[in-house]
Amino acid sequence: MRSNPKPNPISPARIPGRRIFKVAVVTETYFPEINGVAKTLHRMVNDLVDRGHDILLFRPRQGLKDSVNDRRGYREVLMAGCRIPMYSDMRFGFPAKRILKRHFKKERPDIVHVVTEGPLGWSAVRAARDLGIPVISDFRTNFHSYTEYYKVGFAGKVVGNYLKRLHNRTAITLTPSQDLVEDLFKQGYDNVRVVSRGIDTDLFHPSKRDLSLRKEWGVNKDQLVVLYVGRIAAEKNIELSIQAFRKIQESNPNAKMVLVGEGPLKDTLENKNPDLIFCGLKKGEELAKHYASGDLFLFPSMTETFGNVVLEAMASGLGLIAYKYAAANSYLEHGVSAFLPGFGKKQEFIDMTCFLSNNAVLRKKIAAKARKKAMDCTWEKVAQSLENIYSEYSISMNYLEEQANEKINFLRIVESRSQIERAF
């Protein structure tokens, strides 16, 4: 059976006067899969359960030995699915409208929350609408942007139209950053709102810096370690971070670059760059230790909806270079708590990386301010935001009220007709 560690409760299970919701969550990726969507959703779900809500989660089966992991307030339904090409550790769910409809009829959730936009997510939208259950959706991944990195750029428009059609059939689309809200409005999305992300600042903490780990990397306490954490994949624009590091080496030949993560480009990049340190996938305390043991964090991706690693690097006390959008634009100030080159400006990214790599005092100063900002990004705020949206759109607060109003209006019409008939 899969382990499913519970984070520390963020609040009492039930707060007097606060509504408790039954939520059907539909996702094509979930713990223990390692990606930003699975990681943040797992935390959100656990926090909602700890706050007393009833969560019914639908997801594809993750291998033959996978099994449900129910507990009080949380149940799973495993669905049929298939591996995603080039991402063998991830799956998409098959269409399953009839199965979902049967479960929705039986459970009658207050709201259906669709997290991913694959065939399973689309089936959930259709099933919920057929039954008159309010459905909300998340925009968490820029799939249409990925097409440019896999030589199928022609498909970008098709994917973009598919995503817009799906989301516009839901009551509201939730996304983690304000600049993405504005971008989606420009694309024709109807109703979009920010629900941001939180970070565990006790787990990701500068105190996790480990000199023995740095020794394994072949560096002393003063040598510069440039860090990348994330998927080793084309859409992460990872080769720009390597290019920036090579520029650093021209003035600082003792610098080291450490890359944490797995992905389809890992073997290729490792063979091309034998002097770089590829650590593979790290989780929990090990991941926190790797973050805190670095000095300068590079994140050149241009396909993020948020970028959870930015918050993790901030909390870990690292100097940070990232393009000015998504999480970096939401929480960091250029020259104050990070260096933020303009979106897609490759030379700016390299120049700022070199500048900050040569200024240890400034690096520590901006890292401290980034850490302070990360302290405000609590998961409790995220849970409260979701509760507010569930209150606004759920069947218990919204749909039934509309039905009641329609009934009242109908009775008024009947009464008016009766009065007219009596008058004649």
Range-by-range predicted roles:
Residues 266-288:
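Nucleotide-activated donor-binding/catalytic signature segment of Leloir-type glycosyltransferases, i.e.
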Residues 302:
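Aromatic "clamp/platform" in nucleotide-sugar-dependent glycosyltransferases that forms part
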Residues 319-322, 332, 339:
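Short hydrophobic beta-strand element within catalytic cores of glycosyltransferases
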Residues 59, 77-80, 156, 160-210, ...:
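Donor nucleotide-sugar binding/catalytic pocket of nucleotide-sugar-dependent glycosyltransferases
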Residues 334-335, 339-346, 355-360:
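Conserved acidic donor-binding segment of nucleotide-sugar-dependent glycosyltransferases
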Residues 104, 281-282, 289-294, 386:
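Short alpha-helical donor nucleotide-sugar binding micro-motif in glycosyltransferases
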